[in-house]
Amino acid sequence: MNSKRMLLLVLFAFSLMLVERYFRNHQVEELRLSDWFHPRKRPDVITKTDWLAPIVWEGTFDRQVLEKHYRRRNITVGLAVFATGRFAEEYLRLFLHSANKHFMTGYRVIFYIMVDAFLQLPDIQPSPLRTFKAFEVDAERWWLEGSLVYMKSLGEHITSHIQDEVDFLFSMAVNQVFQNEFGVETLGPLVAQLHAWWYFRNTKNFPYERRPTSAASIPFGQGDFYYGSLMVGGTPRNILDFIEEYLNGVIHDIKNGLNSTYEKHLNKYFYLNKPTKLLSPEYSWDLAFSPPPQIQYVKVAHDSHRKL
């Protein structure tokens, strides 16, 4: 073997070694639940579901481990909100200012704001990590129920561009205010929000849709938790799957002369498609109630007495 050929073989072997080292150093390992979730630290509350999904409470998660993992993934998170109606402008101002301060701080965030033509967007201090995109909802759709208009519009935006822009997406109601950090402990493939009031009721008789002909129907004696409708999260693909099921359910009910609520359709979806992560009532506390001892920090608050 001549020296030139030997040199080429050595260089080839060296390049393979560099490539292997690069991918080893840049590979993001999957995060195990036990790496960041410590349910025994909160014996006063339910911290796992029957299908072993974590229920995130303050004190159950290791923020440093989560931060290290998601920073290596270099993620972008989307937050979609729908603002129309009498109090929409006031709510949107509080929502966006508080979200800009507490939602996924230190990460790239794209806010998707869906509004009617008459709404004045609030001034927000610009940041390199924050992008705000406003979309006017088609006026021809206003005869439809609000949740139906919003979800149909959100589904169209996910298909056309959101799925290519973010790794995770949250859809939240505008009549909420972030009060403490809403961070990467909330991320997952399919994330549900426990209903703040129903979580603390000692009953299995949740207000599910019970009419058997409704697409949202859950029979008596069945069901896991009662989920609130103010927030849903996950990957864009999973959010789109939910939206498609919700819209199909609404069409089914209309054909049968029924009109079930968005929240009941949401609960039916999570009954059939178990969420991979649940957020405690700390992440959507109703200001109409005094927090019980289990609520250590209210992350997000809403006022159920005021309607849009």
Swiss-Prot record:
| Membrane topology reported for the UniProt record | Single-pass type II membrane protein
Q: Which organism is it from?
A: Macaca fascicularis
Subcellular location(s) per record = Membrane
Q: Which family does it belong to?
A: Belongs to the glycosyltransferase 6 family.
Cofactor descriptive note: Binds 1 Mn(2+) ion per subunit.
Q: Which residues lie on this side of the membrane: Lumenal?
A: 24-308
| Record topological domains on the Cytoplasmic side | 1-6
Per UniProt, substrate binds at F82, A83, T84, G85, R86, F87, A173, V174, N175, H195, A196, W197, W198
Q: What name does this protein carry?
A: Glycosyltransferase 6 domain-containing protein 1
Q: Name one Pfam family in it.
A: Glyco_transf_6
- Catalytic residues of the enzyme: E263 (nucleophile)
